[in-house]
Amino acid sequence: MKKINYIGLLLIVMVFSACDLDQYPYSEVAADKYVKDASSVNNLVLGCYNSLHDVMYYEWAMTELRSDNGRMYAAGSSSNTTRLVEQLDQGTIVPENEWVKTYWNACYATIARVNNVISYLDVVTDETLRNQYEGEVLFLRSLEYFNLVRLWGPVFIVTSKVPSEVARDMQRSTVDELLPGKMADGDLGRADLNSAKALLAKVYATHYQAGDEKYARAARLCKEVLESESVGNPQSGSDLVAYDKVFDIGNEMNKEIIFAVRYLSGNAGIGSPFGNMFAPVNNGANVIIGTSSGYNTPTDNIIAAYEQRGAGADKRLDVNIAQKYFNTTTQTWVTEGNCRYCKKYVNPVTTQYDGESDWPVIRVADIALLYAELTNEISGPSADNLKYLNMVCERAGVSTYTLTDLPSLYDFRKAVRNERRLELAFENQRWFDLLRWGIATQTVNNYLNSELLYTEYSYTVNDIEDWQTFLPIPVSVIDINPEIAQNTGY
């Protein structure tokens, strides 16, 4: 996708700051009288990108925190916010959970803004530019629907402005209605962007199985992305951007990044909050200035997975996770207590919640590993899919594989799944992968029963059941339309 014009984005922050969008799941947006030409439509498009900030603020809690990668920093907090997060961490979510509701609203707010843009596209007289805008916002809408479907199952299709009285009578659509129709090649491919191809590949890989034509289509889409010049057509690990440089704030939007949610520090209102959200509590400004929440703390489980894979050599561990920090007052390293944190999004700030780090949504290694996975499921290990698996391993500094090491489909599957976990940690991919592989319940229960933290709680942390892999429809939505079917178990 195009790089966001930050000045234009700041304008959109101000323009939309007073809008009261109602996402239950209405898509009414107040009439924009100033929308008269391509420039004003471009501002609306930038507003769609900006709305992703509200989505991402909570998405890690709906995904990474519910997996075996992230957890609460400690047991026993009594704050209301911590209890909401604790529900997501332990699978005890209730329909009244405010974070679940706010994430739902944020997704539908983005969809509403996209629909608003589409309603004004006719004022753009340049066909190429009009198609570009349409392709961009359709991508964003498809991304939000994809996440909604994976987290809730059937949800509401809103593709145009819907009067509130109509929305109150809407029913949830089936997954079949949402995915294949709303994310078809023709829909996403209009902008001819790698981000669209990559997203469609992920949709097909999630919704179909080996043996389906669209599953094979997913593999072909991955290969098209990997062979494109815009990502450098990588053939080995040395062709990829160094792992630590992928997330470097001085190297943003490098060739590894296919699509990212962008942030800008400097008190512009579009800075990243995640440094403060993820830094350890009570760190005395030794990790980051301002309040720190200690959310999304890396688990013992994932640290063990890194150490087992790399035996101290895996470069990704130190990029993604810090296990200590330096106390400048005592001039000592803090290695006990709440010292562990997700390091990937922590960078120096002058104002709290105002970081620079972008959040990668789709990147080259994701698609390389997905291609390796899909082609293995279709026809087993080969020199071709092994190349893309080893490309990622080589860059990480861990041992590569041979076909002798991975002689069977099962052996290759196990290796590529593990590599996806270590490579994409804390990018909100792990939970979706576990769902796609059908092992979310088993994996999370194994983790809950082995993580040391959970033995410190005053109550038993119970296993989750299959129905708990879906989130509950927010109670506020049910209150508006009591005829809406709630997800099983809630």
Predicted region positions:
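Short coil/turn linking the two alpha-helices of tandem helical-hairpin repeats
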Residues: 149-151, 156, 206-212, 377-380
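Bacterial Sec-dependent N-terminal signal peptides
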Residues: 1-27
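An aromatic- and glycine-enriched ligand-binding surface/loop that stacks and positions planar moieties
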Residues: 20-82, 190-328, 443-446
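Long, intrinsically disordered, low-complexity segments
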Residues: 19-21, 71-79, 94, 107-110, ...
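Conserved, well-structured interaction surfaces
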Residues: 38, 42-54, 80-152, 168, ...
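Flexible, polar/acidic helix-loop-strand segments at domain edges
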Residues: 84-95, 301-364
